[in-house]
């Protein structure tokens, strides 16, 4: 029997809204989430390919893995 891949990894992602506080280096940012927690986040690949500019004060969507809630990926701008 072949194993079934139901893309469980994508379903386990947590997405929160946050505000960019500062640019740390290149594509790394410090983000203040809606629940007043500061985390570090980096640009997702599609955001990097589109060369979207993220500035301090922008509202963004941050995706987290359930294994590491201190590091996120910026997947979109609001």
From Swiss-Prot:
- UniProt signal peptide: none
Q: What is one cellular component GO term in this UniProt entry?
A: cytosol
Q: Where is the S1-like domain?
A: 4-78
Under the heading Gene3D superfamilies, the entry gives: Nucleic acid-binding proteins
Q: Where in the cell is it found?
A: Cytoplasm
Print the keywords alphabetically: Cytoplasm, Initiation factor, Protein biosynthesis, RNA-binding, rRNA-binding
Assembly behavior: Component of the 30S ribosomal translation pre-initiation complex which assembles on the 30S ribosome in the order IF-2 and IF-3, IF-1 and N-formylmethionyl-tRNA(fMet); mRNA recruitment can occur at any time during PIC assembly.
Among HAMAP family, the record links this protein to:
IF_1
Give the similarity note: Belongs to the IF-1 family.
Explain the purpose of this protein: One of the essential components for the initiation of protein synthesis. Stabilizes the binding of IF-2 and IF-3 on the 30S subunit to which N-formylmethionyl-tRNA(fMet) subsequently binds. Helps modulate mRNA selection, yielding the 30S pre-initiation complex (PIC). Upon addition of the 50S ribosomal subunit IF-1, IF-2 and IF-3 are released leaving the mature 70S translation initiation complex.
Q: What is the protein's given name? A: Translation initiation factor IF-1
Source organism (scientific name): Mycoplasma pneumoniae (strain ATCC 29342 / M129 / Subtype 1)
List the top taxonomic levels of the source.
Answer: Bacteria, Bacillati, Mycoplasmatota, Mycoplasmoidales, Mycoplasmoidaceae
Q: Which gene encodes it?
A: infA
